[in-house]
Design a protein with these regions (language model features):
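Short, Lys/Arg-enriched N-terminal segments with co-localized hydrophobic residues
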Residues: 1-5
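C-terminal-biased regions
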Residues: 6-44, 49-127
Length: 127
């Protein structure tokens, strides 16, 4: 069931649109937030709480910070909870991480992608 998510062409198109804009150095928070909300609407029917939550936390984070301050999750989980969360906070707008975050939605059949989304969720909540 989870793999269906991004077989939804409409959601994929929106993700591609955001990624294209990022490549062209276009980072318009209001547009991105609207697109993420639309993607979230589409994905609600998947009944995948991790995905729905990740999208909501992402647009709330962007909305309140006007930037994406979450880093790419580490490959290996760090022993102490604190350093793990600190490592996932960026000092500046992290376009690379945001792009990676978006790419996770394009293939949710990969267990690691879902695990990384969970890490992003933890970092959003800790921010």
């Amino acid at each position: 069931l989870i793999t269906q998510i991004m077989e939804n062409k409409q959601a994929l198109k929106l993700i591609e649109k955001i990624q294209k804009d990022l490549l062209q150095d276009k980072f318009v928070v209001s547009e991105i937030v609207e697109d993420l909300k639309k993607i979230r609407e589409i994905t609600l029917e998947l009944n995948n709480p991790v995905v729905t939550k990740a999208l909501r936390l992402a647009y709330e984070h962007l909305d309140s910070n006007n930037a994406f301050f979450i880093g790419i999750p580490d490959d290996e989980p760090v022993d102490s909870k604190e350093s793990e969360i600190e490592a996932n906070i960026s000092e500046e707008n992290n376009i690379e991480s945001f792009n990676y975050f978006l790419s996770l939605f394009t293939d949710l059949s990969k267990k690691n992608n879902v695990l990384d989304l969970k890490e992003y969720n933890k970092a959003f909540l800790a921010y």
